Amino acid sequence: MSFRFVCLILWLLLCASSLAIYFALQPCPGFIVTTLACLLLFQLAYFGSVLLLVCLAAIAQLSARLRIFGIFSENRNHSSK
């Protein structure tokens, strides 16, 4: 999934939730605050998912490096018996 597609989906969700709140509550002072709160939640969810992907990529890269050096391998020989 490309970055532009994710941004488009987040923008559409924000607009849809804003319109739903607007028509459900009619114009009230909390409309702008609620919209900004939804935007903040979407941004936090996106940041969390990107952070998770970065951590998973770092773990995969570290395990690949350890396999190269022979520190971590699934079929290590234990010759100390």
Swiss-Prot record:
Keywords: Exopolysaccharide synthesis, Plasmid. One of its GO terms (biological process) is polysaccharide biosynthetic process. Pfam families: SyrA. Increases exopolysaccharide abundance. This is Protein SyrA.
